[in-house]
Protein backbone atom coordinates (compact mmCIF):
# COMPACT_ATOMS: atom_id res chain seq x y z
CA UNK A 1 0.00 0.00 0.00
CA UNK A 2 2.87 2.32 0.86
CA UNK A 3 4.48 1.71 -2.54
CA UNK A 4 1.20 2.54 -4.34
CA UNK A 5 1.06 5.85 -2.48
CA UNK A 6 4.72 6.56 -3.29
CA UNK A 7 4.18 5.82 -6.98
CA UNK A 8 1.03 8.00 -7.06
CA UNK A 9 2.85 10.87 -5.37
CA UNK A 10 5.79 10.52 -7.76
CA UNK A 11 3.48 10.62 -10.78
CA UNK A 12 1.68 13.69 -9.45
CA UNK A 13 4.97 15.52 -8.87
CA UNK A 14 6.21 14.50 -12.33
CA UNK A 15 3.07 15.90 -13.94
CA UNK A 16 3.45 19.18 -12.06
CA UNK A 17 7.08 19.50 -13.11
CA UNK A 18 6.22 18.62 -16.70
CA UNK A 19 3.50 21.26 -16.91
CA UNK A 20 5.68 23.86 -15.23
CA UNK A 21 8.45 23.31 -17.76
CA UNK A 22 5.99 23.87 -20.60
CA UNK A 23 4.38 26.94 -19.03
CA UNK A 24 4.26 30.11 -21.12
CA UNK A 25 5.90 33.40 -20.24
CA UNK A 26 2.63 35.13 -19.34
CA UNK A 27 2.89 36.99 -16.05
CA UNK A 28 0.44 39.12 -14.10
CA UNK A 29 2.21 42.47 -14.12
CA UNK A 30 -0.29 44.02 -11.73
CA UNK A 31 -3.82 45.25 -11.17
CA UNK A 32 -5.38 48.70 -10.93
CA UNK A 33 -8.58 49.57 -9.07
CA UNK A 34 -10.64 51.66 -11.49
CA UNK A 35 -12.60 54.55 -9.93
CA UNK A 36 -16.21 55.30 -10.86
CA UNK A 37 -15.28 58.74 -12.25
CA UNK A 38 -13.15 59.20 -15.37
CA UNK A 39 -9.50 59.39 -14.32
CA UNK A 40 -6.50 59.87 -16.59
CA UNK A 41 -3.61 59.24 -14.20
CA UNK A 42 -3.93 55.55 -13.34
CA UNK A 43 -0.46 54.04 -13.42
CA UNK A 44 1.02 50.60 -13.00
CA UNK A 45 4.68 51.08 -12.10
CA UNK A 46 6.81 47.99 -12.52
CA UNK A 47 9.26 47.75 -9.61
CA UNK A 48 11.73 45.89 -11.80
CA UNK A 49 12.12 47.11 -15.35
CA UNK A 50 11.18 44.17 -17.60
CA UNK A 51 11.08 43.51 -21.30
CA UNK A 52 7.43 43.02 -22.25
CA UNK A 53 6.50 42.37 -25.88
CA UNK A 54 2.71 42.38 -25.49
CA UNK A 55 -0.01 42.70 -22.87
CA UNK A 56 -3.56 41.55 -22.26
CA UNK A 57 -6.13 43.43 -20.21
CA UNK A 58 -8.78 41.74 -18.08
CA UNK A 59 -11.73 43.15 -16.07
CA UNK A 60 -12.83 41.87 -12.66
CA UNK A 61 -15.63 43.03 -10.32
CA UNK A 62 -17.33 45.20 -12.95
CA UNK A 63 -17.17 46.59 -16.48
CA UNK A 64 -14.49 49.04 -17.59
CA UNK A 65 -14.56 51.94 -19.98
CA UNK A 66 -11.09 52.92 -21.20
CA UNK A 67 -10.16 56.06 -23.10
CA UNK A 68 -6.42 55.58 -23.47
CA UNK A 69 -3.23 53.83 -22.44
CA UNK A 70 0.49 54.46 -22.78
CA UNK A 71 3.57 52.43 -22.02
CA UNK A 72 6.77 54.08 -20.78
CA UNK A 73 10.21 52.63 -21.33
CA UNK A 74 13.33 53.01 -19.24
CA UNK A 75 15.43 55.19 -21.51
CA UNK A 76 17.40 58.40 -21.32
CA UNK A 77 14.63 60.27 -23.14
CA UNK A 78 11.74 58.61 -21.23
CA UNK A 79 10.41 57.10 -24.45
CA UNK A 80 6.72 56.20 -24.53
CA UNK A 81 4.22 54.57 -26.84
CA UNK A 82 0.45 55.04 -27.04
CA UNK A 83 -1.46 51.76 -27.11
CA UNK A 84 -4.47 50.89 -29.22
CA UNK A 85 -6.87 49.45 -26.63
CA UNK A 86 -10.58 48.57 -26.68
CA UNK A 87 -12.90 51.24 -25.30
CA UNK A 88 -14.85 48.76 -23.17
CA UNK A 89 -13.98 45.56 -21.33
CA UNK A 90 -16.82 43.60 -19.74
CA UNK A 91 -16.43 41.84 -16.39
CA UNK A 92 -14.64 38.51 -16.87
CA UNK A 93 -13.50 39.43 -20.38
CA UNK A 94 -9.85 39.40 -21.48
CA UNK A 95 -8.63 41.34 -24.51
CA UNK A 96 -6.58 39.95 -27.35
CA UNK A 97 -2.84 40.53 -27.11
CA UNK A 98 -1.80 44.17 -27.53
CA UNK A 99 1.69 44.49 -29.03
CA UNK A 100 4.23 46.89 -27.59
CA UNK A 101 7.85 47.52 -28.54
CA UNK A 102 6.58 47.50 -32.11
CA UNK A 103 9.51 49.48 -33.50
CA UNK A 104 11.64 46.30 -33.56
CA UNK A 105 13.52 47.47 -30.47
CA UNK A 106 12.63 44.47 -28.32
CA UNK A 107 15.39 45.25 -25.84
CA UNK A 108 13.60 48.24 -24.27
CA UNK A 109 12.22 47.48 -20.86
CA UNK A 110 8.88 48.73 -19.59
CA UNK A 111 8.93 50.87 -16.44
CA UNK A 112 5.30 52.04 -16.33
CA UNK A 113 1.93 51.59 -18.04
CA UNK A 114 -0.72 54.31 -17.65
CA UNK A 115 -4.46 54.17 -18.29
CA UNK A 116 -7.38 56.57 -18.57
CA UNK A 117 -10.82 55.25 -17.76
CA UNK A 118 -13.36 54.29 -15.13
CA UNK A 119 -15.76 51.63 -13.82
CA UNK A 120 -19.21 51.39 -15.43
CA UNK A 121 -22.36 49.39 -14.55
CA UNK A 122 -21.10 48.47 -11.07
CA UNK A 123 -21.43 49.85 -7.56
CA UNK A 124 -17.98 48.40 -6.78
CA UNK A 125 -14.71 49.58 -8.23
CA UNK A 126 -13.74 47.27 -11.07
CA UNK A 127 -10.21 45.91 -11.28
CA UNK A 128 -8.10 46.12 -14.42
CA UNK A 129 -5.57 43.27 -14.56
CA UNK A 130 -2.53 43.63 -16.80
CA UNK A 131 -0.93 40.41 -18.07
CA UNK A 132 2.44 40.57 -19.80
CA UNK A 133 4.23 38.29 -22.22
CA UNK A 134 7.96 38.51 -22.70
From Swiss-Prot:
Record organism: Escherichia coli (strain K12)
TM segment ranges: none
Lineage summary: Bacteria, Pseudomonadati, Pseudomonadota, Gammaproteobacteria, Enterobacterales
InterPro entries: UPF0412_YaaI
UniProt entry keywords in alphabetical sequence: Signal
Signal peptide limits: 1-23
Descriptive protein name: UPF0412 protein YaaI
Family the entry assigns: Belongs to the UPF0412 family.
HAMAP family on file: UPF0412
Domain of life according to the entry: Bacteria
Amino acid sequence: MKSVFTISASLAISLMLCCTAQANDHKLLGAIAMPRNETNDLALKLPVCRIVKRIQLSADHGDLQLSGASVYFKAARSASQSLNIPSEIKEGQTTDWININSDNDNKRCVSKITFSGHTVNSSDMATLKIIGDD
